[in-house]
Curated annotation (Swiss-Prot):
This is 4-hydroxy-tetrahydrodipicolinate synthase. Its main location: cytoplasm. The active site is at Y135, K163. One of its GO terms (cellular component) is cytosol. Keywords: Amino-acid biosynthesis, Cytoplasm, Diaminopimelate biosynthesis, Lyase, Lysine biosynthesis, Schiff base. Homodimer. Pathway: Amino-acid biosynthesis; L-lysine biosynthesis via DAP pathway; (S)-tetrahydrodipicolinate from L-aspartate: step 3/4. Pyruvate binds at T47, I206.
Length: 294
């Protein structure tokens, strides 16, 4: 079995204009990503503001991306919730629309234990019969998929990968010891740790910053064996990432997707936009980064 993808998958931001999904901007953004060597597109995840998208919007966004991508790279749909059976329904619908895989966040608020996590994920996987990427992001859910649990879940034929947003390399190493790395992929959920993640054997990243610098971020993966080269290449990206840490994702990255012309600079409540001075700071950091690349 081969991995779902190797390298950079983009956690796609949802463009808005006047608080409506801007499908024209969405199509142009996806085409930009496809033209710049992206290996997968993840829709309806954290960066997409999925909690404030209606089911109809999620389905239409997914259908738009699936049609445009036309099997050139995997399209992965975020369908996980803290309701197992709603997650099944959303995943089945994503499969019908044409998603190549689903990404499932850990249940939140109605937290469970590790035994409950195993049953939750396996129930969805066995019912939907589509490749599943587990999504571990304890900073948002206050729930961790323990390494032993990942190991158990990795034996399910439909559960094929983990998006690890812990930024904890002890956790990464423990997970890696418990999986068959030829069949189960490990993707970083943190743009700022990708160099180290690749050096320790990670298979790629589900990236926020690749919304705006897809080719540059894929280069880091392509050159991962050249430690000196990618360490130096990553330094200006780190500076841009610092500017993108002014607020929670996706508030800062949408400054730049709007700057590139993909929708207006809008987020949906309860998220609020950056202040004007902060927006200029993010734009200036991006301009300096691009100037340095020329």
């Amino acid at each position: 079995m081969t991995h779902m993808f190797e390298g950079v998958g983009v956690a796609l931001a949802t463009p808005f204009t006047n608080n409506e999904v801007d499908f024209n901007a969405l199509e142009r953004h996806v085409q930009f990503l496809l033209n710049n060597n992206i290996q997968a597109i993840i829709v309806n995840g954290t960066t997409a503001e999925s909690p404030t998208l209606s089911d109809e919007e999620k389905e239409k966004v997914l259908a738009t991306v699936v049609k445009l991508v036309n099997h050139s790279v995997p399209v992965i749909a975020g369908t996980g919730t803290n309701n197992t059976y709603k997650s099944i329904q959303a995943s089945i619908r994503a499969k019908e629309i044409g998603a190549d895989a689903v990404m499932l966040i850990t249940p939140y608020y109605n937290k469970t234990n590790q035994r409950g996590l195993i049953q939750h994920f396996e129930t969805i996987a066995n019912e939907v019969k589509l490749p599943v990427i587990l999504y571990n992001v304890p900073s948002r859910t206050n729930m961790t998929i323990e390494p032993e649990t990942v190991g158990i879940l990795s034996h399910n034929p439909y559960i094929v990968a983990l998006k690890d947003a812990t930024n904890d390399f002890d956790y990464f190493d423990q997970v890696k010891q418990r999986i068959n790395t030829n069949e189960f992929a490990l993707y970083s959920g943190n743009d700022d740790n990708v160099v180290k993640f690749y050096q320790r054997g990670g298979n790629g990243v589900i990236s926020v910053i690749a919304n705006v610098i897809p080719q540059e971020f894929q280069y880091l993966y392509d050159q991962r064996q050249n430690e000196t080269d990618i360490t130096n290449y990553f330094k200006p990206i780190e500076k841009l990432l610092e500017a993108l840490s002014l607020d929670v994702n996706p508030i800062p990255i949408k400054v730049l997707t709007a700057y590139l012309g993909y929708g207006h600079y809008e987020v949906r409540l309860p998220l609020v936009p950056l202040e004007e001075a902060q927006c200029k700071q993010v734009e200036r950091a991006f301009e300096q980064f691009k100037a340095g690349e020329q």
